[in-house]
Amino acid sequence: MRIVCLVVLVLLAPGCERRSSRGSAGWKAVDGGIVCEGGGLQHLACTGLYGEGGKGWERRAVAAGIRAFEPGLQLWSDGLEKSRFIQLPPGTRIDTSRPDEWRFPPGTKLWKEFRWKGKPIETRLLWKKPEGKWLRTTYRWSDDGQQATELTDGEKNVPGTPGHEIPSQVDCLTCHGGREDEVLGFEAVALGHEAARGLTLAKLVEEGLLTHPPEPPPRIPGSGVDRAALGYLHMNCGVSCHNTNPLALGGGGGLLLRLEAAELGSVHLTDAWKTAVGVRSIFRTTGLFGDAVPRIAPGDVKRSTLFHRMSARGLPVQMPPIGTHVVDEQGLGLLQRWIESMPATAER
């Protein structure tokens, strides 16, 4: 089933450019630096992160005009450390007329670097080209950290990591297809969170970089326990997969976990509450012969299939289905505390 879904995604996805890492190098190393040739992007230095045309590679200092950001809600990546950067073309703004679906100006670039115990593993690039198509690709760092070259077919079980998997371009689309304009972590709820750093929602508003600044800024409803769980589900499940976008792979089953601007008035208005709490699941708690129970059984973790799926790895029911081989115990704890805080009620 997953293979069929991926094929459909590739066929239907609008405005995406597929690349191959095979072919001419497009770059050469000269005196410790990188010289880019022919407009190629086969080396990270050629993407503009450290300077144009390979400039700045020796120092690895991010170029002027590129902003670091850290969303207050983050995707679990098996414990790898991450750094994120964005570049908006001068004089442009992000179209935020639809608060849940930001649209980025052509020329926008985003980078995300993954490290394990301080060692760079990969850097991903999203670039909205002038014609509006998104280019998605990944750069694999060499073991000595001196080069980062394009890898489009992915790599499983990267040596020296807890099984980290570098996604192929099709794998990238599996998640990024869940957004109308591809970008996942640079959005209102995560950037407006109190834990956000760098280029936050407040700074975007202050600098006039949004066409329609949110009024009021989005705030996750409920108690601290509610907010922590809803925020975790939003970023790890809802933004990319469990939402109503046509290419979001998890939306068809009826479980919706993205926080929408119009539903932040109370916990009970959120899609996560309405589609999960007390709602019967098609999955069972323990395999084929387990109990038929709700996605979230109020007050009862053992009878909540959402908790069981997030606890699973290496099984078809694991959640998220890709991109992780290690259970996020801290995130699981947020969900457990939320479920246990709910008074037991009649199931729907």
Give names to the regions the model predicted.
Residues 20-87:
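N-terminal pre-domain segments of enzymes
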Residues 1-6:
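Sec-dependent signal peptide recognition
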Residues 104-107:
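Short, well-ordered loop/turn sites that connect or cap secondary structure elements
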Residues 17-32, 101, 120-348:
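Sequence context surrounding c-type heme c attachment/ligation sites in exported
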Residues 13-15:
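C-terminal motif of bacterial Sec signal peptides marking the signal peptidase cleavage site
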Residues 93-99:
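Short alpha-helix capping/helix-loop boundary micro-motifs
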